[in-house]
Each structure stands twice: as C-alpha cells, then as structure tokens.
Amino acid sequence: MPDWLAVGIGGFAGAISRFQITLWLSSWSTQRFGRVYPFGTFAVNIAGCLFIGILMALAMDKKIPDVWQKILVTGCLGSLTTFSTFSYETIGLFRSDRPSLAALYVVANLVVGLIAVAAGMSIIKAIIR
C-alpha cells in the first residue's frame, strides 16, 4: 500500500472520530453547564497522547509493521488530535474574559498530555516484559 494511502485511510478515521467526539462533548457541556467548554478537543488530544505512547512503544520494539504506524500514528492520531483547535479555543477563552480557565486549559493539555504519553509507553513496557 502506498504511504499516502495508508496516511489517508488513518486520517479519515481520525478526523471523523474527532468530529463525532467533539460534537457529542460540546452538546454534553452545553446541557450540563449552559455553555460550550472545550472538553472535546481536550479529550481527543489526551486520548491521542495515550495512544501515541502505546503505539510508539510498540514500534520501538518492532511490534507494529511500518504501514500500521503510518495508518495509526501519522494518519489516525494526526487527524484525531488538533493543536490548531486547541490554540483557537484558548484564544476564545481569553477573549471571553476567562483568563484563568484559558491558563488552566493550556496547563492541563500540556501536563495531562505528557502524563498520557508516558502512561501509554509504561503500559506497553509492563506488558511486553
């Protein structure tokens, strides 16, 4: 399979997943809190961090064929996660006079994201041993 097709297949799956998860969590936050909070972007970014930790730990041990790395990591996780939307939503929080929430959102994405990558890698290392 050509690399571009592998990335495209994964990208399609990741983009559709992000759209559906974000739509569902936006609706949930509106019903629960009366306004939309960026839970969807946070959820997909953290899930993507966890899964990239898992997949890259497997890749380091040569447990995943190269084509699946392209499908899952570059394609699916590349389109599932979104730095641009995270940045846009952060600016939106600042503009809506919620600087504390904006700062919390930035710190939470970074800290929880790093923890999720490390957790994913640790899970695989514990299983493979």
Predicted segments, located by residue:
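Membrane-interface helix-loop junctions in multi-pass transporters/channels
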Residues: 1-129
